Amino acid sequence: MFSASLLLAFSWASTGAPDVTLTAAFRETKPEALSSQHATLARDCESSKLAATCYHAALGSYLLALTNLQADKDAAANQLAQCGRFSALAGTQDTLKAEADALLSACYGLSIALNASKGMALGPASTTLLADAERLAPTSPRVHYFAAMRLFRTPKIWGGDPVKALAHAERALKLFEDSEANASGLAWGKPEVAHLIEQIKAEK
């Protein structure tokens, strides 16, 4: 048997894409592998301040927050705070700004889910971040994914719309086939979009 850390190292080296191995660890319910890779990325972001590394660290924080959302809300809140800090560092690079803004918008959404009292402040901020991301990168599949997620998870009274959510998700799926739409160098998201489409259709 190979250790989780060895398998993670092999996967990372094989794909060259930390975002892919992070999301794979999340989908496959491997919290130790996810935590291990995130810890490395977080340290590297803090020391190097490189935008791409900080984006991956922010993504890891977001995924860990999702993992802890029900079982350990304090841990989830801490990860969401980290997501905000790392996303801000990632947003300093033009090609990643839209991706970082969309991710930060999602982290704000989770923060509101954890503590509804934050909605007054973070709700408008989340909306603005996502609108900016859509304006800056209208062909980013991940931006459309987060737009779909927001519309699907938000109650209708607050602007949620499953029909528009499905349109964004289906647009995202098509954009994953377009190499120009992935100019940011990121590769994650296609399985997540496909799963979201299934969820939206199941609840229609």
Language-model-detected regions and their locations in the chain:
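Terminal, low-structured helical/coil segments at or just beyond the last alpha-helical repeat
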Residues: V163-L166, R171-K204
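Sec-dependent N-terminal signal peptides
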Residues: F2-S11
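Surface-exposed, polar helix/loop patches in the mature regions of secreted/periplasmic/lumenal proteins
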Residues: G84-L136
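Alpha-helical junction/boundary sensor with strong preference for TPR arrays
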Residues: C45-S48, S87, D94, L130, ...
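Amphipathic alpha-helical repeat scaffolds of TPR domains
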Residues: T15-A24, S47-N68, T95-L114, T139-P155, ...
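Helix-turn-helix repeat elements of alpha-solenoid scaffolds
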Residues: F26-A42, K73-F86, G119-T127, A165-L173
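Outer-membrane beta-barrel transmembrane domain signature
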Residues: G123, T127-A131, P141-R142, M149, ...
